[in-house]
Amino acid sequence: MDSSVPGGQRTLQKRRNAQLQKEKKANQTPASPRQAGFGGSSSSILKLYTDEANGLRVDPLVVLFLAVAFVFSVVALHVVAKVSGKIF
Amino acid sequence: MAGFRLIDLAKPFLAFVPEIELPYDNLPFDDKLVITLTTALIYLFGQFPLAGITKESVDVKDPIFFLRGVFAAEPRTLLEFGIFPPIATALILQLLAGFKLIKVNFNQRTDRELFQTLIKIVSIGSYAILANIFIASGYYGEDLSLMAKFLINSQLIGAGFFVTLLIEVIDKGHGFASGAMAIIAISLSTGLVDDLFGVQQIPVGQEGHREPRGAVINLLQGFRAKHKTFLGALVNAFQRDYLPNLTSGLLVIVLGGTVCYLQNIRTELSIRSTKARGMSNVYPIRLLYTGGLSLLFSYSILFYIHILGFVIIQLIGGNQEGSIINKVLGGYESTEFFYLARFPLSLLTPPTSFFAVFKQPLTVVTFSAFLIVTGVWFATNWQEISGSSSRDVSKQFKEQDVALAGHRDASKELIRIIPVASATGAATLAVLVAVGELLGLKGKGAGIVVAVCSAFAILEVVTVDFQQTGGQSSIAQMLGGRAA
Amino acid sequence: MAKQNAQFDKLVETPLEFVKEGNQFLQKCKKPSKKEYLKIIQAVGIGFVAVGVIGYIIKLIHIPIRYLIV
């Protein structure tokens, strides 16, 4: 068995160590949040957001309401445009 | 860390870009279901016509009609670009980060925050760029006043801003799985119902006749209409091209059914517990390992190519017959609804009807090849970086004290299966979409495939959640307990 | 010349190998049985139509608004 490895057992050991080191290194810098263990996109699910950044925090319900309000503001814009004729 | 990093660009924005709060606790099943649905419905509500655009028809028509289905975009509405910017940005930035082309240390919380804020700003920025490309091209009317330009801009960017936030609401755990995918699934299913059973009466032709939007309703109404013969009504229902017809409706249903079949092809690896004796189970690996994401990627790239073409031909060259740009890039042919690309770009444009294939037969080869190559490339790389590669799965096995029956090293067996599965799955999906699109579905074929894949991905998360919460759901009880 | 040939061979071989590998994989896969498939189709179909109808109601709200203001 030993003779089949060029350089003998010790080189084999070295190679193994190098391989292990490489794998360790690859594990140390994860390629995605999920690989690091923090959720995020999986193989078949695309996720954009995982963490809560220290920004301007808003409640989800507020966002939903504002989104609807935004659409209604566009409706209002239509009304203004129609009532005032050609304003823009 | 020394040196410049792309994610540091997001730093100045961190303070004032709105950020949805994470839920304090794992929300109850019913709440999540309601929030997912409401969010997607609000998205649908956004398909409202833009104010301030001309109502007369303009020369510049829709150049990206066949890309709209996948991204849930409706022309000349607030959702002109649908959810293309967030999806494309997220896919591409996450790929780049996976390749280590963008330096992000995902182990660090600050880096993850910067990365997701970067995705958010780039998507909103993309909405702004796209909006101005379309305004400048004359798509919304020529000689718009400064006021009108400003209003269209604020409407489109505002809508884009809210769309990214809606996605975030679901992504952050207030809803199920992924916001982008929930929106696609619900918007496409609504589109399907509208195309088949829509009751809205739309004036057709010069004689003031009206026809309903839904293909099935049209068939029924056609039989009773006085100005149509029985046979005429039948033929009309199957092949009218100004509104959805039954042929394309049936094709879409067949495509959806095929995806259901593909979704459930899998290899089952038998696993056993290393702790408890005699505990054995199966671990399925799906053929569609990366689901519909490979298609989303292919279509994102297509979108970029076509927008680039549109910018060069329309914005720079003005789509003038005989100009150098048009000689090289082919230019656009203006039809009643669409802008049809000519030679080089037409190679990547699916035909508007089955018979239009013969105008550019090469498209069959180039379009399918494009979908297959980009899809397979994406799937191979995505499974590697998204934290579900063979290495990650075998690590999971170890953590859960599970081993593959008959194999000492799980990762060796998995590495033989997972990359092949994802590549083959992506190729099969690409072929399916290519067939559908080449038959003239104008984006609806690709749309339904992505939608069904997304629905399955979400359903899986929903099922797991349902079981984890012990099936405590009044909604499920109301539906007779068949929600799972 | 020889190098080019080798490259060309590789260009032809890679897709062929890919198709072969994929085919082998597909053959090994477990496909849903007819009964299973019908059940899935039914569930997905009902789900799709149910969600679609809910979404369509939202679209219906749009029609009168559009009619009034556009």
From Swiss-Prot, chain A:
Residues 1-41 are annotated as: Disordered. It holds the Pfam family Sec61_beta. Residues 1-60 are cytoplasmic. InterPro entries: Sec61-beta/Sbh, SecG/Sec61-beta/Sbh. It is found in: Endoplasmic reticulum membrane. Keywords: Endoplasmic reticulum, Membrane, Protein transport, Translocation, Transmembrane, Transmembrane helix, Transport. It is a single-pass membrane protein. The keyword Protein transport applies. Disulfide bonds: none annotated. It comes from the Eukaryota. GO terms for biological process: intracellular protein transport. Its main location: endoplasmic reticulum. Heterotrimeric complex composed of SEC61, SEB1 and SSS1. Necessary for protein translocation in the endoplasmic reticulum. Belongs to the SEC61-beta family. This is Protein transport protein Sec61 subunit beta. The gene is SBH1.
